[in-house]
Amino acid sequence: MNLKKKNNDIVLEEVWCENGAGSTLPLLKYPLLEQTGIVEHCFTTRIGGVSKGIYESLNLSFTRGDEDAAVRENFRRLAGAMETDVSKFVFTDQTHTTNVRRVTAEDAGKGIVKERDYTDIDGLITNEPGLVLSTFYADCVPLYFVDPVHRAIGMSLSLIHIS
């Protein structure tokens, strides 16, 4: 699946990536963000994971009742597809605030391989290469920020709900 503009430029691209578990999973990417040379990014779908039942397949939430082991394996597969490690992920603690946290290498792994020492964070920013900023969306609009001057990136959710 690729979404295109009138002039046939690809706006959103589906890329199938090896996940390190012997299979593939689809990642959705914005070519314009990739072209900055500053950020590698993706959106996930529900395809390519191990969760069962109502959480089938690539559930990435530890807070919805899925088994932690399944969610961890799903993140391991996502990290494999992104050619990184889960210890590089940094998670928000989304509660619909306007709080944004600047994250550093000290924050790597918080929310997945070690405890978060912060709460009520709906946005993340960094200028440190190698960190994976992780935010979660259901009916909010995801926001990506790229600052080419300071070589910084950010992610947040909008406080405007789609539904």
What are these regions (language model features)?
Residues 1-163:
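Active-site microenvironment for binding and transforming phosphate-containing groups
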